[in-house]
Amino acid sequence: MIKKRKKKSYTEVYALGQYISMSAHKARRVIDQIRGRSYEEALMILELMPYRGCYPIFKLVYSAAANASHNKGFKETNLVISKAEVNQGNTVKKLKPRARGRSYPIKRSTCHITIVLEDISFYQQNEEYLMYLKKPGCSNENRNLTCYDTYSSGGLWDKK
């Protein structure tokens, strides 16, 4: 079995909720509305949406932001939901007794929700630095930010 190694990102924080008693389809309907939005905007959307699945997702987003501020020292105003995914969990199966000795199955579906928050202040600082380097007052030694094309180095790969 091949395992993918995740790079440890210094700008990402996540929260994982497992075995939440909700259908994965219903959770995805809510998650699609907040993916890519800022932390504060996502909280406002989740508070105003009339779905039952909003509350556990609200708690997860809030928990991820608490992880960001406590563990990494990020400010909540700079957080953006970079990744939000819903996976299907186990299905709890029960039998409900009915008339004449019969029984009907009840399926209770669960889901696993992952929320990843990213700090965008790191990228804003890099943009400011690049804008500083592009100013005409900077020397040419610091402005060399070219990336050499590794595939056109000659040899076998240039031929068709």
Swiss-Prot record:
Coiled coil: none annotated. InterPro entries: Ribosomal_uL22, Ribosomal_uL22_bac/chlpt-type, Ribosomal_uL22_bac/org-type, Ribosomal_uL22_CS, Ribosomal_uL22_sf. It is found in: Plastid, Chloroplast. GO terms for biological process: translation. Keywords: Chloroplast, Plastid, Ribonucleoprotein, Ribosomal protein, RNA-binding, rRNA-binding. Its main location: plastid. One of its GO terms (cellular component) is chloroplast. One of its GO terms (molecular function) is structural constituent of ribosome. Disulfide bonds: none annotated. This protein binds specifically to 23S rRNA. The globular domain of the protein is located near the polypeptide exit tunnel on the outside of the subunit, while an extended beta-hairpin is found that lines the wall of the exit tunnel in the center of the 70S ribosome. Part of the 50S ribosomal subunit. Belongs to the universal ribosomal protein uL22 family. This is Large ribosomal subunit protein uL22c. The lineage of its organism: Eukaryota, Viridiplantae, Streptophyta, Embryophyta, Tracheophyta.
